[in-house]
Amino acid sequence: MASTVMSSLSLKPTFTLEKISVKGLPSLTRSSSSFKVVASGVKKLKTDKPYGINGSMALRDGVDASGRKPKGKGVYQYVDKYGANVDGYSPIYNTDEWSPSGDVYVGGTTGLAIWAVTLLGILAGGALLVYNTSALAQ
């Protein structure tokens, strides 16, 4: 029995993978050129202090909410390395970037008209979708 199995294994041809090239078809093999991804330099945020109330670490009675004294650990130990906004708190409006007079919309009447048309288009599109999927459309 063992000799039969061994002879049947030795009679089978060895499997070889041949490269067949067809004219007009692109090659699917990878080229030998190396691909290297290089990250850009560290982009620091230019602020005087971290945003948010915790940037100054001004704690009442010198302890945090759990009653422990701060050790200077946490995300704020990386302020000098990564920039001030390390905790991910990023306000939409910064007082340094506010307009001196907030009375006039910078976009003007054209900007307001574009905004209104866009809003009406979104609402009309939603109403059309509701109508088309309701029993009223049939």
From Swiss-Prot:
Transit peptide range per the UniProt entry: 1-39
Keyword Hydrolase: no
Cross-referenced InterPro entries: PSII_PsbR (IPR006814)
Major subcellular site: plastid
Superkingdom, natural source: Eukaryota
Subcellular location field: Plastid, Chloroplast thylakoid membrane
GO biological process: photosynthesis
Keywords: Chloroplast, Membrane, Photosynthesis, Photosystem II, Plastid, Thylakoid, Transit peptide
GO cellular component, one term: photosystem II oxygen evolving complex
Record-annotated membrane-spanning stretches: none
Family assignment from sequence similarity: Belongs to the psbR family.
Biological function: Associated with the oxygen-evolving complex of photosystem II.
Protein name: Photosystem II 10 kDa polypeptide, chloroplastic
Species per Swiss-Prot/TrEMBL record: Solanum lycopersicum
